[in-house]
């Protein structure tokens, strides 16, 4: 099977961007609680 690079990148971005966004919010919240 041929791997669709663009589809792979799009999927990776679709997963990583929201994850990074949530991590940033979590870190900011954790810092404020300190």
Curated annotation (Swiss-Prot):
Q: Which Pfam families does the record associate with it?
A: PsbM
Q: Would you tell me the Gene Ontology cellular component terms? A: chloroplast thylakoid membrane; photosystem II
Specify the protein's topology with respect to the membrane.
Answer: Single-pass membrane protein
Q: Where in the cell is it found?
A: Plastid, Chloroplast thylakoid membrane
- The membrane spanning regions, by residue number, are 5-25
For this chain's UniProt record, which GO biological process terms are given?
photosynthesis, light reaction
**What is the purpose of this protein?**
One of the components of the core complex of photosystem II (PSII). PSII is a light-driven water:plastoquinone oxidoreductase that uses light energy to abstract electrons from H(2)O, generating O(2) and a proton gradient subsequently used for ATP formation. It consists of a core antenna complex that captures photons, and an electron transfer chain that converts photonic excitation into a charge separation. This subunit is found at the monomer-monomer interface.
Similarity annotation: Belongs to the PsbM family.
Q: State the name under which the record lists this protein.
A: Photosystem II reaction center protein M
> Where does this protein come from, organism-wise?
Agrostis stolonifera (Creeping bentgrass)
């Amino acid at each position: 099977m041929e791997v669709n690079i663009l589809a792979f990148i799009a999927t990776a971005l679709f997963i990583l961007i929201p994850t990074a966004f949530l991590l940033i919010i979590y870190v900011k919240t954790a810092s404020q609680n300190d």
